[in-house]
């Protein structure tokens, strides 16, 4: 910890490497076997799990960039086995949101220069490629991947196992298992390669396709399409996850452009 500025009341686990010029605040808890790179800042009210790596110049627990923030105590919580690369910024939560906490789940990977704003919730096994920017209160479900230089509007929800193409601007929710991209962002198919890598069977993937054919390709509005999928398709976990996501969407889901689609 030579040349590092670590508050004596910070709780540091076993086998933690703290590089030169790191700053760690008073109300910080870092789990075992972590590595904190040079010039990183871990500010107050941050809890970091075990086996995490935080690289050079990252700032974890910065004050929210939100005018509703009034200096209240709020938090960042990072799970186990998380990697946060150079110059990422992760802001604390806000009381105004009702969440008061920014969360990054286990086994997630934030590449260089990613920004995670106040009250975002990133699930487990997520990948955010370099220069991704998440606005406040964005939810990213488990196993989602967001391509580099993508910008995500506040309150947006990205579903489980979804993949967002690099350079996207998202202002609508991305339903589970989908690939989206282009400008404006549109649905372009199922994330088949990613799903097969994670052990999904073709039978499961076909059930996803069946749902999305009705949602996007029957000429119905989304509400009517969901009712049709509910009535016409047999029950399955995949159907339930997709329809529940759409039913609970607050911003509406991304549109479909048949000229851009890879859906079969």
Enumerate the predicted regions with their spans.
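Terminal amphipathic alpha-helical/low-complexity segments used for targeting or macromolecular assembly
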Residues: 1-3, 8-9, 14-15, 51, ...
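Structural signal for interior beta-strand "rungs" in well-ordered beta-sheet cores
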Residues: 1-181, 185-186
């Amino acid at each position: 910890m030579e040349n590092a500025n670590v508050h004596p009341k910070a709780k540091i686990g076993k086998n933690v490497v703290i590089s030169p010029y790191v700053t760690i605040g008073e109300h910080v808890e870092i789990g075992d076997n972590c590595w904190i790179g040079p010039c990183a800042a871990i500010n107050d009210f941050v809890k970091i799990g075990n086996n995490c790596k935080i690289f050079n110049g990252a700032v974890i627990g910065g004050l929210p960039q939100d005018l509703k923030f009034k200096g209240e105590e709020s938090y960042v919580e990072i799970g186990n086995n998380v990697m946060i690369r150079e110059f990422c910024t992760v802001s604390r939560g806000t009381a105004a949101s009702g969440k008061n906490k920014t969360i990054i789940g286990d086994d997630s990977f934030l590449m260089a220069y990613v920004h995670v704003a106040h009250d975002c919730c990133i699930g487990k096994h997520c990948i955010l490629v370099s220069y991704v920017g998440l606005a406040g209160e964005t939810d990213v479900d488990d196993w989602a991947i967001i391509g580099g230089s993508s910008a995500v509007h506040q309150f947006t929800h990205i579903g489980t196992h979804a993949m967002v193409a690099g350079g996207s601007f998202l202002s609508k929710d991305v339903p589970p298992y989908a690939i989206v991209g282009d400008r404006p962002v549109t649905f372009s198919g199922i994330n088949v390669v990613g799903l097969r890598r994670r052990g999904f069977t073709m039978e499961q993937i076909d059930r996803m396709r069946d749902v999305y054919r009705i949602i996007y390709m029957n000429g119905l509005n989304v509400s009517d399409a969901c009712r049709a999928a509910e009535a016409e398709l047999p029950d399955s976990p995949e159907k339930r996850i997709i329809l529940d996501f759409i039913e609970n969407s607050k911003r509406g889901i991304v549109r479909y452009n048949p000229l851009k689609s890879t859906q079969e």
